[in-house]
Amino acid sequence: GLKEPVQPQVSCRYRCNETFSRMASGCSCDDKCTERQACCSDYEDTCVLPTQSWSCSKLRCGEKRIANVLCSCSEDCLEKKDCCTDYKTICKGETSWLKDKCASSGATQCPAGFEQSPLILFSMDGFRAGYLENWDSLMPNINKLKTCGTHAKYMRAVYPTKTFVNHYTIATGLYPESHGIIDNNIYDVNLNLNFSLSSSTARNPAWWGGQPIWHTATYQGLKAATYFWPGSEVKINGSYPTIFKNYDKSIPFEARVTEVLKWLDLPKAKRPDFFTLYIEEPDTTGHKYGPVSGEIIKALQMADRTLGMLMEGLKQRNLHNCVNLILLADHGMEEISCDRLEYMANYFDNVDFFMYEGPAPRIRSKNVPKDFYTFDSEGIVKNLTCRKPKQYFKAYLSKDLPKRLHYANNIRIDKVNLMVDQQWMAVRDKKFTRCKGGTHGYDNEFKSMQAIFLAHGPGFNEKNEVTSFENIEVYNLMCDLLKLKPAPNDGTHGSLNHLLKNPFYTPSPAKEQSSPLSCPFGPVPSPDVSGCKCSSITELEKVNQRLNLNNQAKTESEAHNLPYGRPQVLQNHSKYCLLHQAKYISAYSQDILMPLWSSYTIYRSTSTSVPPSASDCLRLDVRIPAAQSQTCSNYQPDLTITPGFLYPPNFNSSNFEQYDALITSNIVPMFKGFTRLWNYFHTTLIPKYARERDGLNVISGPIFDYNYDGHFDSYDTIKQHVSNTKIPIPTHYFVVLTSCENQINTPLNCLGPLKVLSFILPHRPDNSESCADTSPENLWVEERIQIHTARVRDVELLTGLNFYSGLKQPLPETLQLKTFLPIFVNPVN
């Protein structure tokens, strides 16, 4: 018979990289065809593009296996586990993850071999929460995750809001002062070494404290794989994650996702349970172009496509409703300008020190280690305080920084710190040029520093928005998802239980360590050597008798003044007794000769008139033995210390009632300068807040934190700091204001959630922090207390008290209240 004529080849389909043959007719598809100008017209699309593309196309479906492709679209790719992530969608007609409805809240949908849901922690560097608010419609994958899963309005970074600092806090649940990575550039006098991101010293385990989540997992029998994370390539505590990658920013995001998916394909015996994934965007673009730019939108879309690729890859493995995924950022991004720089050269004739410049500056001696301890930090702060009518930074000694920052208790934190205004930077001199585009590092209360937090998977509640929280809480959350026991950390375990479908950990209430003693009503001591006098009291016996409450009156006082339970004392061997008055209750400490706390409730209508007769009137509390009482002679006129009141005597409804507060058990030692702030706060601001919130419960008291570690000092430590008076001087005073979130209800008849405002006010001799030594209080007090806002949890750690012990709600709800931080910062327009 006749042979069919050989048809000349016209396409490269199924022919890529074939061996060149001179006998073949038509066009070629071998790798040298371009040199001979003999390629088929579809050679580029069929044979070259697949080596550069991470996705399938109709043309690629069913392709013959090609060497060097990034991913495959051949018929056997599922079996070979090298398909592009969109293979099933493009080549098999399945719907994509993005087009699917949100998963139903059925049981965990895991394929065979996955008894426990893997956890992926995915960080998009510098993804500020505002980006998602403004441009969510341009990021369909992230928006779907937000819609279907759990997300927070924002997640608060720790200070300074830098990359390494926050990534390592997320991994350990520790504040920077606890884990040691206190900035991207650090000097440690004990090691006599400098740390920077680019130097090899960053790999020295001596810098890295705490236990990162990848170790917690491996120590408890799980496997952990990290595709980049600060600290993951350091031999911390003698070991690495099970699998880790050395940082290389040139690796494409798609290659990172593909590798994580390959790890999920490993046989069960080798497969990790915990994964990290990190991409540099939108941070890199934010630095270059600033947070409001067309370029940032492109970077966000690139980040969104990276998440989409991960989710499609998970769906292809039927893991999209099996894996728990946390998508978060380390910090936000702020716009900067070379017109907004504060130069140290404008404050010093000779800038003779070393300065870490930028949005979170620190200053130390340049001659280290020699002058490290003798450097005049106080002098520098003084020289930078109240120098100009308008300064765009405030200088602090680290021990005086707002306690909410937890940024003092580490030798690596230099003593001089500048808190810089939004969009400004503080630098040495005009040589500084890195002032265009965007940066981060500022106060973590600034809106521009807020980060995203989204979570999705069978462990999380669906379609759930939660209030903001701090990133120190994420470590405990990850431990719960992996069913691990966390290492000690700064988070409050259980405070994020409302994110989880079936919380793994149930917090238990704190146990009181010291119960109150009794302080019985007794006769007036004779002779009275207290040095106290009060000429306006004519009927002393009658006035004192008011302090002798019967049991029914005590119960009524407790219902009124302690609506959420009595603060419990978690310090050991604390000797104190409860003192009941009609309008306030206090816990008087025989160790420090002042109340540990005082609690009272004021209403919208509480009168705050100051009775003229009582301005200089004080007497001994007859319930306290003279030896355990403060005396008026402790306060000599030449001392800078004066008696201040915890419960204000002017919150009274009758002339007689004021005398209940004019007693030595209600006084605390205060610097005269501080009483200006304290008195204005109590006579003006607290009544104002009570009007706005339909009443307030107020608990206030002293704090002793001489070693500035953020935890209460022992009595031995306190005693070392008592000089020229037997009364110890507090380092701070706290005020916790609680009201009903539903403002139709007073604090006493509140059935729903509570609202809290708490403050930790540094007790300092002057008001230079506000440059207010001559200004009237209405111009500066409220702004100052707002800088020193804090969580109730911070107050608890600094006092050894436990608040809200009488609340009937589940404990995790109370922990949410205790970890809430009120924020007053106004965004820059």
UniProtKB/Swiss-Prot annotation:
Alphabetically ordered keywords of this record: Disulfide bond, Glycoprotein, Hemostasis impairing toxin, Hydrolase, Metal-binding, Platelet aggregation inhibiting toxin, Repeat, Secreted, Toxin
Residues the entry annotates as binding a divalent metal cation 1: 283, 287, 440
Location of the motif Cell attachment site: 36-38
PROSITE patterns given in the database record: SMB_1, SMB_2
Temperature dependence: Optimum temperature is 37 degrees Celsius.
Residues involved in AMP binding: 249, 287
Gene Ontology CC, one term: extracellular region
Catalytic residues (positions): 163 (amp-threonine intermediate)
Segments forming domain SMB: 8-51, 52-96
Tissue: Expressed by venom gland.
GO biological processes: nucleoside triphosphate catabolic process
Catalysed reactions, semicolon-separated: ADP + H2O = AMP + phosphate + H(+)
Short name of one Pfam family: Phosphodiest
Glycosites: 17, 194, 237, 383, 572, 652
InterPro entries per record: Alkaline_phosphatase_core_sf, DNA/RNA_non-sp_Endonuclease_sf, Endo_G_ENPP1-like_dom, ENPP1-3/EXOG-like_nuc-like, His-Me_finger_sf, Phosphodiest/P_Trfase, Somatomedin_B-like_dom_sf, Somatomedin_B_dom
UniProt binding sites for a divalent metal cation 2: 125, 163, 330-331
EC code(s) of this entry: 3.6.1.-
pH dependence: Optimum pH is 8.0-8.5.
Cysteines paired by S-S bonds: 12-16, 12-29, 16-47, 27-29, 27-40, 33-39, 40-47, 56-61, 56-73, 61-91, 71-73, 71-84, 77-83, 84-91, 102-148, 110-322, 338-435, 386-771, 519-577, 532-632, 534-617, 740-750
Modified how: N-glycosylated. Glycosylation counts for an increased mass of ~9%. Contains 16 disulfide bonds.
Subunit and interaction comment: Monomer.
Function of the molecule: Hydrolyzes ADP with high activity. Shows weak or no activity on 5'-AMP, 5'-GMP, 3'-AMP, ATP, cAMP, and cGMP. Is devoid of monophosphatase and proteinase activities. Inhibits ADP-induced platelet aggregation and is cytotoxic to human keratinocytes. Kinetic parameters indicated a higher affinity for the substrate bis(p-nitrophenyl) phosphate compared to others snake venom PDEs. Is recognized by the crotalid antivenom produced by the Instituto Butantan.
Name of this protein: Venom phosphodiesterase CdcPDE
Organism in which the protein naturally occurs: Crotalus durissus collilineatus (Brazilian rattlesnake)
Lineage: Eukaryota, Metazoa, Chordata, Craniata, Vertebrata
